[in-house]
C-alpha cells in the first residue's frame, strides 16, 4: 500500500512539474470568474443567503496571512484577496449527522473565494466536497451528495 501511495505521489509531482500548474484533488471544486473580487464576493454571499441557510462566520484569509507574515518569517504575498463563508443548514446538517455521527466533521459547510496577485481580475470560488468513507453506507453517501449539490449550486450562482 505504501508503495502505491509513493507512486501516486510521484506521479502527481511529475504532472505538476510538467504542466506548471497545481494538481488539485477531485475533492476540491473550483470555478473561475473574471471581475472584481468585491463584486464576486457579494454574489457569493447572496448565493449562500438565497439558499435559506444561516451564515455562521466569514473570514478574511488574506488579511490573516498579511498580519502574521512577520511572525513566521514569510515574505511572499499569496493572495490579493481571500476569504471564506461558513454556514449551516438544519436540513442538510441533520441528514449528514443522522446518517453517521462522525459526519459532524463536515459542519459547518464552507465556500471560499480568492484572487492572486499574479492573476488580477481572475476570481476563484470553490468548496471542498464532503466525501464520506465508503464504509459509512448509503445514507451518508446520499446526504453527502445532497450537500455537494448545495455547495455546487452556491458556487455556480456566484460565478454566473
Protein language model regions, located:
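Bacterial N-terminal signal peptides
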Residues: 10-20
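Sec/Tat-exported extracytoplasmic proteins
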Residues: 44, 51-55, 69, 151, ...
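A short, structured loop/turn motif at beta-sheet edges
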Residues: 114-121
Amino acid at each position: 500500500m505504501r508503495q502505491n501511495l509513493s507512486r501516486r505521489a510521484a506521479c502527481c509531482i511529475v504532472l505538476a512539474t510538467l504542466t506548471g500548474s497545481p494538481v488539485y484533488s477531485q475533492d476540491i471544486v473550483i470555478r473561475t470568474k473574471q471581475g472584481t473580487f468585491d463584486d464576486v464576493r457579494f454574489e457569493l454571499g447572496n448565493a449562500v443567503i438565497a439558499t435559506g441557510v444561516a451564515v455562521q462566520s466569514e473570514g478574511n484569509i488574506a488579511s490573516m496571512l498579511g498580519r502574521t507574515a512577520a511572525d513566521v518569517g514569510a515574505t511572499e504575498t499569496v493572495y490579493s484577496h481571500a476569504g471564506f463563508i461558513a454556514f449551516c443548514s438544519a436540513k442538510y446538517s441533520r441528514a449528514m449527522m443522522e446518517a453517521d455521527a462522525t459526519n459532524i466533521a463536515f459542519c459547518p459547510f464552507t465556500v471560499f473565494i480568492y484572487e492572486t496577485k499574479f492573476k488580477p481580475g481572475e476570481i476563484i470560488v470553490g468548496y471542498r466536497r464532503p466525501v464520506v468513507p465508503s464504509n459509512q453506507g448509503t445514507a451518508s453517501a446520499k446526504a453527502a451528495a445532497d450537500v455537494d449539490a448545495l455547495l455546487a449550486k452556491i458556487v455556480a450562482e456566484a460565478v454566473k
